[in-house]
Amino acid sequence: MANMNNILLNMGISLLVLATSAGAQGEQWLQYHSEREAYRIIGGRSSNLTVTTDKPQDIKLPEFKTKQQFFAEWSTPMVNSGKVGIILDRTSEQGNWDRLFIDSNGNGHLDDEDAVEAYQTTEYYTYFGPVKVVFEVEDGPVTYHLNFRFYDRDDQYRRLMIYQGGWYEGEITVAGQKKNCMLVDYNVNGTFNDKSLQSNESDRIRIGKKGSEDTCFVGNYIEIEDVLYQLEVARDGAFIKLTKAEDVKFGNIKLPEAITEFSAGGENGLFTREMENGIASLPVGKYRIDHWEIDRKDDKGKNWTMRGYGFSEKGDFEIEEQAETALEIGEPVTAGLEARLNGENYEFSKSVRGSLGEYVSLTSGGSDVRNLWKMKARSKDGTFEKIYPIPDQ
């Protein structure tokens, strides 16, 4: 009888372990990578830092080779002060700004730092990277990399651009299947778990085939092969956790029936829906429209896609439990023409906008439509008349 009880107990433990592992897969660790031109691999975006000749106060500085320097600060929550000091110096008084100092250990001073030499210089640009920074966190030191591009044409156009220099990537298991996972610090602030209503402030995650560009916002949830998971991302990007989402509250969104695809994002993550009769469901929360699409065929059977994107706060909406939120988006769209006098010549540009001020593009067969838009110019006395193609901006 005791043996039978042991067998039943072991079976119960085994079933419990299986049930637990099916719902929550634990920490799945990723590997850190750095690259000089990381944007070619991970996409991402740059951030512009203001530079000044004013020396910061109460900061120990390194020895310089010239009389003037430029100073900047990079904001990151990974150091106690919330900012990392950066200095640009140059080898000679008339040369490029080819030396960069950064507070790589986050101690608030730069007198203990060595200069990073530029790997490329042009007439106006200087390139650095990947530049290593080490954050001290509870579990020990964490390595992070940045790439820099300094533009120095004149006082009006001078700026320091900062790019991602590293990312996390590796193989994870989702519902028993191996998939590639990539984490990107999209807003370049040193952390990998940022969630936001504004897409530019949300970090990015890819789960699927290696090399896939199907990118989602880091958020509370992520959909993988039509299954909704709760997502947890380590602040430093070292691991993720996926748990099958349960007891999630949903509401509906109502769109014009012409909309064939709709996407919206926020702290819940990014959700893309193939629309049916203008109705789709989303988890309860606040969102901003990411894009909409309308697909049509012309009388010759050619496929066309109109896409609205680049929404401001006018594209914000909220989904409430068991309620329906209606959005008037899509058609009609408005085409505008702008004229600007440049010297003795006029320059013309077009813009196509949706009802919420979003940009609108038109593609056919997946390719941008070139020379679709045309402008007719005619002199007041009628002696001159010509049709000009207007390229997409």
Regions found by a protein language model. Give the residues of each.
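Sec/Tat signal peptide C-region and signal peptidase I cleavage site
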Residues: 20-24
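N-terminal secretory signal peptides that target proteins for export/translocation
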Residues: 1-7
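Exposed boundary/loop context
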Residues: 5, 16-17, 101, 169
